[in-house]
Amino acid sequence: MPDIVNRKVEHVEIAAFENVDGLSSSTFLNDVILVHQGFPGISFSEINTKTKFFRKEISVPIMVTGMTGGRNELGRINKIIAEVTEKFGIPMGVGSQRVAIEKAEARESFAIVRKVAPTIPIIANLGMPQLVKGYGLKEFQDAIQMIEADAIAVHLNPAQEVFQPEGEPEYQIYALEKLRDISKELSVPIIVKESGNGISMETAKLLYSYGIKNFDTSGQGGTNWIAIEMIRDIRRGNWKAESAKNFLDWGVPTAASIMEVRYSVPDSFLVGSGGIRSGLDAAKAIALGADIAGMALPVLKSAIEGKESLEQFFRKIIFELKAAMMLTGSKDVNALKKTSIVILGKLKEWAEYRGINLSTYDKVRKRE
């Protein structure tokens, strides 16, 4: 078995220090315009950003999506993120726990999260390919118990696996049958998330038919995992690197993925993530159809700089979110979901080509 511990460290190193953010891709969020209200009818001080994340109340409609864990230095990053998200009342997801299930010495880098963040929602994480490889209820329960998780994310990453030097692109349909059966035995909800290439309406409908109602778009336009694996291929002299260059813009852009999932599965719980880099991006994602926004890479980079840097990052994000809410007259998160928007450019073209009627969608995104 490849050394997945070292692979996790290399992934974080490349993500944090190489140019892989939004490389050759776009979120399409620039095509989402929040309509300015010159007289908002509210005061900044009364804006309420609280919302629900399954059974728990959270302070802002933003979560940290899973990215890291597996070795001591990664555990230190997880500890910083957990301490700060606990302070701000923000849910936190961890990276894939496969490494901790298969290597006991990696468990503490994940377990530390709940030790320093006793109250916020924590989201466990395993990969869909592991279901094909033999994972079942036992491994899911282990991942959940390891961090006393409030939910578990199951990540889809076929594009990353295809170009990864040691990739395992295994996505047979019986993995969904296993996931459906496992979900019936778990005490916490399952969120199916992508890994930088977005969820299409076809995938959302398929997952929904197997009982999945919670999604995380992780759309194109943020951390480019094909680029990360391309860099790893280059370092190893792997011929896959040349092929990976042709796929750097592969995927469903984040804004399009939010629309596709919300339109095809209207009653879903939806995290809009992938290239969310500001509070304004988060506000756009929520107004477009997400329940909350998610981000990973900018959190990772700030955490590497230290706890104070990450705290300042979240203060900035929350201020920008509240500014967008103020300027749209949205006194709370539900109002933000119903605020007036205009969809332009490539996103409008995408929606129309994919059969999404914009007038109908406006009602769907508002949950009317």
UniProtKB/Swiss-Prot annotation:
Compartment list: Cytoplasm
GO molecular function, one term: magnesium ion binding
Keywords recorded for this protein, A-Z: Cytoplasm, Flavoprotein, FMN, Isomerase, Isoprene biosynthesis, Magnesium, Metal-binding, NADP
Stretches of the chain forming a coiled coil according to its record: none
GO biological process, one term: isoprenoid biosynthetic process
This enzyme's EC code(s): 5.3.3.2
Annotated residues for binding of Mg(2+): 161
NCBIfam families the UniProt entry points to: IPP_isom_2
Protein's name according to its UniProt entry: Isopentenyl-diphosphate delta-isomerase
Organism: Saccharolobus islandicus (strain L.S.2.15 / Lassen #1) (Sulfolobus islandicus)
